[in-house]
């Protein structure tokens, strides 16, 4: 699963997920899966969607993952009193703003790409849409 190799600080503030995204254009592949809503994707969700797409395209074509979970989420164990410091890191997330391209694909037909992205979108907690590369 995806997570940073090393970080300057182990734990992070909660923060807010406002604003618009960077990385809104399809830049590596021909087709892309773009976020319409905002939220956060866990490393498990990113990997689950990637596996669904890879299985559907049957090892032809190429897939790029354009998001990386770089924010640690902590939680305290069950039935522990409040206080005594922040909990341990449980999992990693990537904060998503509307317009962010999550995955890209190349080397397959548009029909197969649409089906693969539909399978991936079912694994994700945010609303997404299918986009193609615009050639100027």
Curated annotation (Swiss-Prot):
The keyword Phosphoprotein does not apply. SUPFAM superfamilies: Ribosomal protein L16p/L10e (SSF54686). One of its GO terms (cellular component) is cytosolic large ribosomal subunit. The keyword tRNA-binding applies. GO terms for molecular function: rRNA binding; structural constituent of ribosome; tRNA binding. One of its GO terms (biological process) is translation. Keywords: Ribonucleoprotein, Ribosomal protein, RNA-binding, rRNA-binding, tRNA-binding. Pfam families: Ribosomal_L16. InterPro entries: Ribosomal_uL16, Ribosomal_uL16_bact-type, Ribosomal_uL16_CS, Ribosomal_uL16_dom, Ribosomal_uL16_sf. It comes from the Bacteria. Belongs to the universal ribosomal protein uL16 family. Binds 23S rRNA and is also seen to make contacts with the A and possibly P site tRNAs. HAMAP family: Ribosomal_uL16. Part of the 50S ribosomal subunit. This is Large ribosomal subunit protein uL16. It comes from Shewanella baltica (strain OS155 / ATCC BAA-1091). The gene is rplP.
């Amino acid at each position: 699963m995806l997570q940073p190799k090393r970080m300057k600080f182990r734990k992070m503030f909660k923060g807010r997920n406002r604003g618009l995204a960077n990385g809104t254009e399809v830049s590596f592949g021909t087709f892309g899966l773009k976020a319409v809503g905002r939220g956060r994707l866990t490393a498990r969700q990113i990997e689950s969607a990637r596996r669904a797409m890879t299985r559907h395209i049957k090892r032809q074509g190429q897939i790029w993952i354009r998001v990386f979970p770089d924010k640690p989420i902590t939680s305290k164990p069950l039935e522990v009193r409040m206080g005594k410091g922040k909990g341990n890191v449980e999992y990693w997330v990537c904060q998503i703003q509307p317009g962010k391209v999550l995955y890209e694909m190349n080397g397959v037909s548009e029909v197969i790409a649409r089906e693969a992205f539909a399978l991936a979108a079912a694994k994700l907690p945010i609303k997404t849409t299918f986009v193609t590369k615009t050639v100027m």
